[in-house]
Amino acid sequence: MYPHLTSIGIEQPEAIERYSLRQEAANDILKVYFAKNKGELFAKSVKFKFPRQRKSVLVNSGSREYKEITEINRTLTHIIDELDIITKRKHTEVDIKKKILGDLRHLERVVSHKISEIEADLEKLK
């Protein structure tokens, strides 16, 4: 019924509760959350990385100037279509400020973790 979801290892698509999608460098990160079972504190989730597809687009035909852009992986679009069917997701306008703040907080955590990792590596060199 959901061939693209099963192709990435999701065996029980009917247990999917929601999903999130974000872009990180040259990848799209899909996180799928499953319904929480009785007695569990946290819902189970799985994360997938999809490399963005690179494409050269003609910017100026006179100078034959090209610009490289990235776009969402075609397989990922099929997976999202199936997830939308399952979650009956309503495509509503997301508060842009809330999204930017969320992305900023995530970036802060990633950078903080990376700084700690680099500092630990420096300590090993002393």
Swiss-Prot record:
Q: Name one Pfam family in it.
A: DUF3461
Specify the domain of life of the species encoding this protein. Bacteria
Which positions, given as ranges, span the membrane?
Answer: none
Where does the record place a coiled coil?
Answer: none
Recorded hits in InterPro entries, A to Z, give: UPF0325
In the record, the note on similarity to other proteins reads: Belongs to the UPF0325 family.
What name does this protein carry? UPF0325 protein PBPRA2971
